Structure formats: C-alpha cells, structure tokens
Design a protein with these regions (language model features):
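A broadly tuned "polar low-complexity/structure-edge" signature
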Residues: 6, 17-18, 35, 44, ...
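Long amphipathic alpha-helical scaffold regions
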Residues: 9-12, 25-26, 216-234
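Aromatic-enriched hydrophobic runs in primary sequence
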Residues: 4-5, 17, 128, 136-141, ...
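Long, internal scaffold/assembly segments composed of regular secondary structure
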Residues: 40-43, 47-55, 62-66, 70-71
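Short beta-strand elements that form the blades of beta-propeller/WD-repeat-like
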Residues: 1-7, 14, 47-60, 97-110, ...
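Repeated scaffold domains used in trafficking and secretory/extracellular systems
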Residues: 33-44, 83-103, 131-145, 176-189, ...
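Envelope-exposed proteins and targeting segments
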Residues: 12-13, 22, 37-39, 104-105
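Surface-exposed loop/turn elements that mediate protein-protein interactions on large endomembrane-trafficking
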Residues: 13-32, 63-88, 110-133, 156-176, ...
Length: 244
C-alpha cells in the first residue's frame, strides 16, 4: 500500500491506496490549527499500522509529536489513534523521518539522534530506546532490521563516525572513517558508502569488506544476485563484485 498526504487551507489528509492505484476507504484528517502538519508518515509491512510525525505551534514555538494509528485495533478512537509521543517524550527533538522497520518496531530520526519505538502491544506503543548524539548528523539510512547514521567524529583523526543499530536500539557496530562519501545505503547485511567513482563496503561486524575505484560514474551500489556479491551501477555499465 501507498500513503498520500494532501491538504487544503484548514486540514491535511492522509489517504491509503492499493498498488493498483485504487483508494482504500481509510484516511486520517488532521486540523492544521490543532493537530499540526504531517512531516512524514510510514506504514507497517502489514499495512494496518502507521506512524506519523507532526509539527505544530504551541505558544509561538514549533513542537513535534509522533502519533501511532492502528486500523485493525484502534476502533475505540474514531481517529484510530493508539499512541502519542509528545515533546517531553522526545527530549524536545524534531523527527523529520519516521519508519516502520518491521511489524512491531519503528524508528524516528530526529535532529538529536534516534528514537526506537515498539508496537509489540499494538494498543500501547512504547519507546524502547533513545539515542542522543552530540555530533552533527550528516546522513541517515534504514533497511528492514537496521537503522544507521553518519555523524561528525568528535575525536580522533577520522572526520566521520558510522553507527548501525538494531530495531530495539541496541548497537550493531560503530566505526570511524575518512572515506569521502556521497551515498550511504544499507543492503541486507552490508553497509554501502560510495561516491561518483568509488565505494567502500562494511559488513555488520564493522569490518571493511571492500574498497575500490571504478573507470565509470557510480550511481548506486546494491546487493548482488548471489550472497557475498555487490552490484556497482553506472549510467551505461554495471559491474558485479564478489566480496572476500
């Protein structure tokens, strides 16, 4: 399913659509003057839950809240709301991106770090971990069972720090690096850093598995067709590499 955010002068509306483009009889209406403006929305893999980050004004200050909806169990509330995380629950952070990682875990990427949330009890979402980062957050990435951030490195010679987390907020690995990346993706159990002529690959043990340059412009780096391989995608060329 696909979610679409639409708005008029007084309210915003989040609609759900099937893959064939037909609309479902499910939507959420939010008054801009009260509920705020939806910054980002994410559906659970099963399509019955969604999480939305709202920005709103309170006494002239911009605030942020995260709202969980459940269209299978939230029938007691006409808006299908099952949980709300207010500014005090988020350390007054602003969540610009929210994502369901699986059916019972979600992550909010904020200007202060990451907030991991659980819907194991679907009628009562809870915060499982909050990662507050002092360093400037430069890039984020997420894919199923992993969420990652690249920040400035506060100490040491390397300018950047890469951190990867599980859905419950526990750390998978953390490492510093100096590679000058423009792209950052998580593919399976690999972390892909790349720029227009090279790439650098880490596994989930934090080990660098590959670093190399190419004679063509790199647009994207993907997991390969077979385990232990990656695909280097260019405009008119594709190269498959087997990792050692």
């Amino acid at each position: 399913m696909v979610a679409s955010v639409q708005e008029d002068s007084k309210a915003s509306y989040i609609y759900l659509y099937k893959k064939d483009g037909s609309a479902l009889d499910i939507y959420v209406k939010s008054l801009l003057s009260g509920d705020g403006y939806p910054v980002d929305v994410s559906l659970s893999p099963g399509g019955t839950q969604w999480i939305t980050s709202f920005m709103y004004l309170e006494q002239g200050m911009i605030k942020n809240k995260i709202v969980f909806y459940n269209f299978g169990l939230g029938k007691n509330d006409p808006k299908r709301v099952v949980g709300i995380f207010l500014p005090e629950d988020l350390s007054d952070a602003m969540a610009g991106r929210v994502r369901f990682m699986d059916e019972s875990h979600a992550v909010a990427f904020t200007d202060k770090g990451l907030q991991f949330l659980s819907t194991r009890v679907e009628t009562s979402p809870e915060s499982t971990s909050q990662i507050l980062l002092d360093e400037n957050i430069r890039r984020i990435s997420y894919k199923n069972q992993y969420a990652g951030v690249i920040t400035d490195n506060g100490s040491g010679a390397d300018p950047y720090c890469l951190r990867i987390y599980k859905p419950d907020g526990s750390t998978v690995f953390e490492t510093t690096f100096s590679y000058q990346y423009t792209g950052f993706d998580i593919e399976g159990d690999l972390v892909m850093l790349y720029n227009d002529n090279s790439c650098c690959i880490y596994n989930m043990a934090g080990t660098r598995k590959f670093s190399g340059t190419f004679d063509f412009t790199v647009n994207k780096v993907l997991a390969g067709r077979f385990p232990g391989t990656i695909l280097i995608m260019g405009n008119q060329k594709m190269e498959e590499i087997r990792l050692k």
